[in-house]
């Protein structure tokens, strides 16, 4: 397990970034579930209209190969296979006229689909 806290992000380059907005929303969702053991897992899998797709789920388990990014007391988990597709990406939470959703801004994505949940490299 590789853990990077928000404080360490100033000295250690985290594999991806977790915005204040995303951390706040995850914290709110965890409080609604009344389970402080939950962490947000972000992963990449094959599929979608562009070849790869992003996924989000809550998980209580931190696997040995997980990268852990901690911010505002919230932990974001990324497995070692997915992290290679997410290097330098930003996980954000946005609310606008179309609704509210977690958004990944990924500099490694050569193209993305219109929905923003799948990409190609």
Swiss-Prot record:
Cofactor binding note of this UniProt entry: Binds 1 iron-sulfur cluster per subunit.
GO biological process, one term: iron-sulfur cluster assembly
Keyword Iron-sulfur attributed: yes
Described function: Required for insertion of 4Fe-4S clusters.
SUPFAM superfamilies for the chain: HesB-like domain
HAMAP family for the chain: Fe_S_insert_ErpA
Cofactors: iron-sulfur cluster
Name listed for the protein in its UniProt record: Putative iron-sulfur cluster insertion protein ErpA
Residue sites binding iron-sulfur cluster per the record: 49, 113, 115
InterPro entries: FeS_biogenesis, FeS_cluster_insertion, FeS_cluster_insertion_RrpA, HesB-like_dom_sf
GO molecular function: 2 iron, 2 sulfur cluster binding; 4 iron, 4 sulfur cluster binding; iron ion binding
Recorded family membership: Belongs to the HesB/IscA family.
Keyword annotations of the record: Iron, Iron-sulfur, Metal-binding
Pfam families: Fe-S_biosyn (PF01521)
Keyword Iron-sulfur: yes
Known partners and oligomeric status: Homodimer.
């Amino acid at each position: 397990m590789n853990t990077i806290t928000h404080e360490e992000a100033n000295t250690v380059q985290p594999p991806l970034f977790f915005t204040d907005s995303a951390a706040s929303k995850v914290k709110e969702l965890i409080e609604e579930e009344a389970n402080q053991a939950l962490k947000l897992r972000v992963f990449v899998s094959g599929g979608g209209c562009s070849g790869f797709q992003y996924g989000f789920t809550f998980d209580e388990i931190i696997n040995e190969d997980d990268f852990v990014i901690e911010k505002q007391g919230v932990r974001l988990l990324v497995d070692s296979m997915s992290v290679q597709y997410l290097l330098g990406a930003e996980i954000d939470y946005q609310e606008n006229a179309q609704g509210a959703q977690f958004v990944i801004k990924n500099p490694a994505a050569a193209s993305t689909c219109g929905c923003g949940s799948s990409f190609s490299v």
